[in-house]
Amino acid sequence: HLSDRRQRQMCIRDRICPDAPEKCAASPTGFQWFDLMDQSPEQILSKSLVAENKLNKLIDEVKEKYDLKANDIIIGGFSQGCMITLQTGIKRKDTVNSIVGYSGRIISTEHLSKNIVSRPNIILMHGDLDQVVPIESLLEAKEFFGKNNYEIETKIFKHCEHRIPTEGSSLG
């Protein structure tokens, strides 16, 4: 069952908008799926697989609780949340409707290219002044998904740092 906290985090019936399960080590007001600081790419991938399992479990709980099909569900995330939703969303056997990602990147293109299972709609948005996750991450993701025959929409926000601007919320 979803906790009361998780239910409050549901934006609307068919979207999952959870906070990550841990308080963010780098930002006391933020949340994280796992600590990214001082980690090797292998450690980050390993920890992301644990986070992926947690998100899959949450998606399955939501499907059951609200009697939804995977295609009724849109998943999204900001920063590390975007990274986890991208990894999780395209590896699910039951394809979610869409992935909406803000200011994130692909954790491992090598891992992801070997594990593509589904093809949800994808929209990625990023600020052109983001210094936490550079804009190049969006361009790399766009190239990756293009090479793997995904239709992907992208939006770059002018004069925007590492945040979700109002326009981005509306597009999502």
Task: Please state what every model-predicted region is.
Residues 76-81, 85:
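Gly/Ala-rich beta-loop-alpha elbow adjacent to hydrolase catalytic centers
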Residues 13-29:
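Conserved alpha/beta-hydrolase
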Residues 1-8, 12:
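Single conserved hydrophobic/aromatic residue that forms the stacking wall/gate
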Residues 139-172:
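C-terminal catalytic histidine-bearing segment of alpha/beta-hydrolase fold enzymes
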Residues 94-106:
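A conserved short beta-strand
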Residues 123-126, 130:
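Short beta-strand/loop motif that positions the catalytic acidic residue
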Residues 74-77, 100-102, 125:
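Short beta-strand immediately N-terminal to the catalytic nucleophile in serine-hydrolase-like folds
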